[in-house]
Amino acid sequence: MAPKKPGAAGPKKAQKTRRREKKNVPHGAAHIKSTFNNTIVSITDPQGNVISWASSGHVGFKGSRKSTPFAAQLAAENAARKAQEHGVKKVDVFVKGPGSGRETAIRSLQAAGLEVGAISDVTPQPHNGCRPPKRRRV
């Protein structure tokens, strides 16, 4: 019989999970990435560390309903609520992408109680880069 290896089939230790400490960040940045299929809202501190995030899929929408403005509204409200728990009161908004949830997400950040400062569009523009997808024929 082979000697037993230490810790081979012994009792498992409980995993130590570290609770994220609540930061107190009064001013942050809201990054809204709106694609044709989804909308992702991330709220960060001034250094760029993510405080809270939400997306249309994370809120509970699936398939083509993720790309609706209503799904973007709920995602932005969810992210704003979580950010307010960390003390965020004012945000600058950076919008990226061509999706339908851009304006709705900005409005719902304001409606959730965050003061919106500057709004800037940071959608990347190709200098004749990749070939775009072919036209749809319906």
Curated annotation (Swiss-Prot):
Functional note: Located on the platform of the 30S subunit, it bridges several disparate RNA helices of the 16S rRNA. Forms part of the Shine-Dalgarno cleft in the 70S ribosome.
> Which UniProt keyword terms apply here?
Ribonucleoprotein, Ribosomal protein, RNA-binding, rRNA-binding
Question: What does the record give as the organism's lineage?
Answer: Bacteria, Bacillati, Actinomycetota, Actinomycetes, Mycobacteriales
Q: Which organism is it from?
A: Mycobacteroides abscessus (strain ATCC 19977 / DSM 44196 / CCUG 20993 / CIP 104536 / JCM 13569 / NCTC 13031 / TMC 1543 / L948) (Mycobacterium abscessus)
Basic residues compositional bias, start-end: 13-22
Q: Name one GO molecular function term.
A: structural constituent of ribosome
Q: Name one GO biological process term.
A: translation
Q: Can you list the GO cellular component terms from the UniProt entry?
A: ribonucleoprotein complex; ribosome
Q: Which InterPro entries match?
A: Ribosomal_uS11, Ribosomal_uS11_bac-type, Ribosomal_uS11_CS, Ribosomal_uS11_sf
Question: What gene is this protein translated from?
Answer: rpsK
Task: Please give the name of this protein.
Answer: Small ribosomal subunit protein uS11
Region Disordered: start and end of each range?
A: 1-27, 119-138
State the similarity comment.
Belongs to the universal ribosomal protein uS11 family.
Assembly, in brief, is:
Part of the 30S ribosomal subunit. Interacts with proteins S7 and S18. Binds to IF-3.
Low complexity: bias regions? 1-12
